Every structure is written in structure tokens, then in C-alpha cells.
Amino acid sequence: MSNKTVVETVTALVEPILAEHNFELYEVEFVQEAKSWYLRVYIDKEGGITLEDCALVSDQLSEQLDSADPDPIPQAYFLEVSSPGAERPLKKEVDYQRALDQYVNVSLYQQIDGHKVFEGYLRQLSPDELTIEYMDKTRQKQVVIPRDKVAKARLAIKF
């Protein structure tokens, strides 16, 4: 079974479990690292996910996967259910919306104003652009970044 099919199947199995507990699905990935396969399910909720929440979803999803016929994942794998973390990637539009006025790290495909990475506050968001407020030495500046220039974006922790 292809990785994409596994992800789609697991997504269909886990969404009703998450809906029952008012959790949301952040991402499902099925990857091979060294010789082992990992099924990773990232979940979230308003106020943040707890270890108990992850254990609950892991137990219920494990039951669903074990009882599914035919077996959606015939090879051996490790199931991991977790939060996307404090420095979670911004992938979907809803992730960017939630990150408004949050401290973010944005990596670019090519430089803008001599920088390829900006770390600052996401102040504005449009379908085509992001506006980041950042510190350049001791001065506060803003940069408007076209979305097609963004290689990666994530929440960041300000030190």
C-alpha cells in the first residue's frame, strides 16, 4: 500500500475519534526511518493537547487499525500520536490564521532585503503575502513577503 493511501485511510479512521473529543487533526504521516516504519498522527485542540489526550487517541486509533479488514498497513510500524509542538510548521491556511500576531520563523527560496530568513511577528496575512514585523539590530522593521517565495514557515520561540 502506498504512503499516500495509508495516510488517507488513517485520516478517515482517526477523524471520527478526534471529532468525538473536540480535537483536530493537524497531520498524518507514514514514513520510513532507517529500517522502521512510523505512523505519526499529530493532533491539537484549543488550549493545547495533553499527554492524556494523545494516549486516548492512540488507544482508540490502535483498536481501529487492529480491527480493520483488510489491514490498512500490512507491514510492522510504530504508532506515534503527539502534538505538533511549540514550533509547529505552518502548512494550511488555518495555521497561518492562528499564527497572526505570533512570533514566527519564515525561510525563503530567495533573499528579500538581503535576508533569506525572517524571525518576527506575523502582522498581516493575505492570499498572496505575509507581513512580518522584525528587529534589524536595534530597529523595528516590516517586510512584505510574497507567499510563493516562502520555503518554510513555523511558529518560533522568542528568546
UniProtKB/Swiss-Prot annotation:
Which keywords label this protein? Cytoplasm, Ribosome biogenesis
**Chief localization class?**
cytoplasm
Q: Which domain of life is it from?
A: Bacteria
The listed locations are:
Cytoplasm
Q: According to its UniProt record, which protein family does this protein belong to?
A: Belongs to the RimP family.
PANTHER family assigned to the protein according to its UniProt record, in alphabetical order: RIBOSOME MATURATION FACTOR RIMP
Q: What does this protein do?
A: Required for maturation of 30S ribosomal subunits.
Protein name, please? Ribosome maturation factor RimP
